[in-house]
Amino acid sequence: MSYASDVKKELTNLAVHRENAKAELMALIRMNGAISIANHHFILNIQTENPAIARRIYRLLKQFYDVDSELIVRRKMKLNKNNLYIVRLKTGTDMVLADLGILKDYQIVEVAPTEVLTDDAAVRSYLRGAFLAGGSVNNPETSRYHLEIYSLYEEHNHMISEMMNQYGLNSRTTDRRGGFITYIKEAEKIADFLSLVGATNAMLKFEDIRIMRDMRNSVNRLVNCENANMDKVANASSKQIENILLIDATVGLQQLPPKLQEVAVARLEHREVSLKELGTLVPGGPISKSGINHRLRKINQFAEQLQKDA
């Protein structure tokens, strides 16, 4: 089961609170519902590939409305295709849709009523329904951080984004596959959204994974930095040794001033050590790192002058 499926499973197991659960049902029907007409009556089909979501829609309808509804399973013949679960409402469809603010004067209303947008519990409930209907979230262990909710209507998509941003989630919108998405890419904001809609266990798992990823990234950056420093030291040491050998082969190390000669000999004898360690190995030492570095620069300048004079 994917991480997104785990999130939705947790959400479908949440207790239904009568005072705000209509907002969740409102989002589920607005985003996954399809209206048809048969025998001069409206029929509502609410479709999903997730059986737990279908059962939750069915329970919500039964809890709020005394209507004739049924749960239908359509098996797909193609390989690797999920079954399609349909909650069908045959009677009272226009009454239910009007009560939920989805149908007005026989026209579809693309956004939620104002009272939903201004009530904290209702906003959380609506966002939960919207995520169940059209949401997805990447596995934080293997992918880039990304959570999105797909909506068919642009105005509705912007409304979802506005709802999210009431809580500082920094969501953005864009068009996608004949519709629109609201998305979040910041890890902390994704965790905040999961907590907001009630997926507490999924949020805690997400945070654990995020913290471990951040720690691994910090360690990797530190290792890369240390490796870069080691390469820098190795390259500098190689150049120093090359110049010292040039001086020795050309005029002899005895031509160097005594203090430079001591450092040159010590470097040849201890080619792998750092400047700080080299300072403790010079006969006239210990010499500070900056002191050793100064003398090695003088040796390099001496070698460069020999090359110019050659």
Swiss-Prot record:
SUPFAM superfamilies with a match to the protein in the record: Homing endonucleases
A GO molecular function held by the record: DNA binding
Pfam families xref list: HTH_WhiA, LAGLIDADG_WhiA, WhiA_N
Any GO BP annotation: regulation of sporulation
DNA-binding residue intervals: 274-308
Keywords: Cell cycle, Cell division, DNA-binding
Family the UniProt entry places it in: Belongs to the WhiA family.
Function summary: Involved in cell division and chromosome segregation.
Protein name as annotated: Probable cell division protein WhiA
Organism expressing this protein natively: Lactiplantibacillus plantarum (strain ATCC BAA-793 / NCIMB 8826 / WCFS1) (Lactobacillus plantarum)
Taxonomic classification: Bacteria, Bacillati, Bacillota, Bacilli, Lactobacillales
